[in-house]
Structures are given as C-alpha cells and as structure tokens.
Amino acid sequence: MTPISAIGDYNGHVGLGVKCSKEVATAIRGAIILAKLSIVPVRRGFWGNKIGRPHTVPCKFTGKCGSVWVRLIPAPRGTGIVSAPVPKKLLQMAGIDDCYTSARGSTGTLGNFAKATYAAVTAIYAYLTLDLWKETIFQKSPYQEFTDYLSKNHKPVGVCRSRR
C-alpha cells in the first residue's frame, strides 16, 4: 500500500509524504513522518495592487512529476482556488487563497499529480521576485569619477635633461 500524506498549517507551510509498506498502519505512519520532514515555506504574493495581506502565488510556477505538469497562475482576490481536488487541497494547506491551475498529462495518477503540485509549490520559495532583489550600489570607475579633471587642457610638462 502507498498512502500519500499532506500536511500544512494553512499559513505558508506545506509538506508531502509518500511511503510504501505492506502494512496499512506502518505505511500511513511513515507517510505522515515523511510529510513532516518535507515541510517547505510558501511565499505568497499579490495580483494587481498590494492591498491587504498576500493571497496568491507571486508569479507563474510549474511543477513536474512523471507525465504530469502542474502550472500555478496568480488570480485576483476573491477568485478562490480554481483547480482539481488534489492541487486544491495542497494549495489550501499552503495558505494560498486565490490561484488558477493548469494540469497536463495523466492527472488520474494521484501520486504524480500531488507530487507535481508539491514541486510547483516548492519552486515558489526558490524564486526571487523583483521586490526581494537586493539594491545594487555601483561604484564609478576612476575615469567617470575624475572626468572633469581629465577633460581640462593641461600644459604638457617637459622633462629637462642636462647634457654631460
């Protein structure tokens, strides 16, 4: 038996565990332990204006497992999660309120569908959006810094050599 266990706090953390075992209780217990060990943070963002708290994914993300591709697309506030039941539950556990999803491949394979959704959700935290970029301070080159001095006409300085 191969149970799939999802765990989340509905506020920015989600985990997924899959365990295979001959006994049902052992498999379920192992899947729960693996789900707890694989908890990842989920960064949420805005769609449109930045009013209120973050409610959707920051930008489009894709996850793949087996033949299944899952794409998470930001949605306006109040849309809800427009998805099949498997990704919908994972996204709810992650604390995402509004999201469109697109799935391709053999989505009837429940394990691959859940793993592809989890892969897309983990990709969210790995991607740095524009608001998280560190401010870059550029230093001027010496030619730019002293351009006014270098542009002035200077008298050529000759070297006097004495004859011996």
Which stretches of residues belong to each language-model region?
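Ribosome-associated RNA-binding proteins
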Residues: M1-R164
